[in-house]
């Protein structure tokens, strides 16, 4: 109780200081009643609207450029977007039927040639989605509104995600850009088909203006806000103050302690009570299997039983997140493949006694009586667990893990390199343990998750596609690939069970908690936010995630006045 008393006192002092003294340089020259103000996505001034760059200005994808489908990860439902339908017409051919009467912002007609061009560009140039041509054979326009994709090796799971992740670009504009400028061109006046256009970019914000001629007005309804202002991230105290004063409508920032003031200031969250936030990804503890003792399966399983996930959930996050189940899977699209029997037989839970037993059986004992276990050969057993410096919640989490390790006689020291050094170390297997979330974000298929935690690309000079601990299991890699390349649902369920079983037995990484889709809303200017009882959309302004329910949110929120 002391922890919570101190936290309450700290939050009270913060609120007093924020409300009394903080001043935010935020002067809108726009009609506030028609403007939605968001934050949490931008970490610096907007500088590029080039959709071929994954970290382009948030909103470029979704507000300006649009995908063929949108996807609601809460409902596990696809909504036809630029496409009106799509289907596999054979094992290796997919036909996409496009909507008619869609125009680009400059008035040019959108048609099948734009879709073909979007993919052909990735075949002829090196862009981030070019690897699709490793398994795609051709893409052809059969008429103005029909596109046929032919695959040399169909990747059904990946294609299901491709349908809502790929933003279509206008051929008549991008075909004029030289190949050597495709990535360097900032595209300051982006021309898309979407519901908003770029109005103004400043050092502290990006302003989008509604496209009142958007084709989707007649199909989905017109977005309610005339303007959307996305603010560059400020400190947690400033963001909290802006929320409490109604200067901010939607915050996608992680705000420690927000659950303690949400009722007082009328803040809305996805859940009314704990965990408050919708789960967004899985945080795992990776172990470097190329180093001792992490190369020992018995030791890795002991680490799984060692960690008190509830301490992380409650003491670090104050109940804002959920503990992960042993498989790491969550959400409708993934949990449909979760095998409860496998979890029952091979899963784990916090049990320091079990962890100690596993260590003793494997020869990790305290020979000299100093309170710390040694390696089976008698060498000292001292490890480090790293997270990036400044990631305060993760830093607290690994301190908690370190305390859990001490309880069972294992010395694991928290290590906080700066973000660039952290990346260098994980890419080069230069660590003992680390926390990571790569490719664990909620999606339509658990293939994404497995292809991240057990990616097969581990034998090059660097590891850049997940599986940071270089866990090497060719048989498992083959099963994950098979899951990607079959359509039969019964076969997929069988493979999913086998994959989960192998990961739980070998335990190359330990799923710990689900980071939240941090989302706090106010109702001074806008109401009818989506929530657990009305999940019509998802209030997320991060990156290019607007196709995951943010556009539907913009359409369905209502003016408070």
Regions found by a protein language model. Give the residues of each.
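Surface-exposed binding/hinge segments that line
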Residues: 87, 131-176, 524
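Ligand/substrate-recognition segments at binding pockets and active sites
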Residues: 38, 203, 235, 365-441, ...
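N-terminal lobe/hinge region of extracytoplasmic solute-binding protein
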Residues: 39-89, 120, 191
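Local pocket/hinge segments that shape ligand/substrate recognition
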Residues: 41, 162, 221, 252-358, ...
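Ligand-site clamp/hinge motif
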Residues: 184, 213-261, 399-402, 411-413, ...
